[in-house]
Amino acid sequence: MKIKAKKSLGQNFLVDRNVINKIVEAGNILPDSVILEVGAGTGNLTESILEKKPKKIFIIEKDEKLVEKLKERFDNKIVIIPKDVLKVSEDLISTSKLIVFGNLPYNISTQILSKWITNDNQNNWFENYILMFQKEVADR
């Protein structure tokens, strides 16, 4: 069954292997790295992250159909948090500094970034962010 991106959730799935590889390389993932991936979609980025063998991968995914697809694809190799990223408290996840990957939805990109910057300044949760935005968000 082919999954279609939901415009209402601002979904845009990564499929270009070259782009995915560049994103993963930018993360400098080590064996003790703890990863947070926001909106894993169909799991193409997740698969490449797993090849680097990080300590743990947390995925926040709101779309119930994608959550099921990710569970089927990755079994117990990842921890899925089936919630809206804006409603997740990072202290539920953070046992060490996180490397955050995300192809952020246009409609909530600014809110997510503001939340993370504010929380990180207070709690120092994040080691690195590798985020993709639509050009319109970056221009703002």
Residue locations for each model-derived region?
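Catalytic cores of RNA-modifying enzymes
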Residues: M1-R140
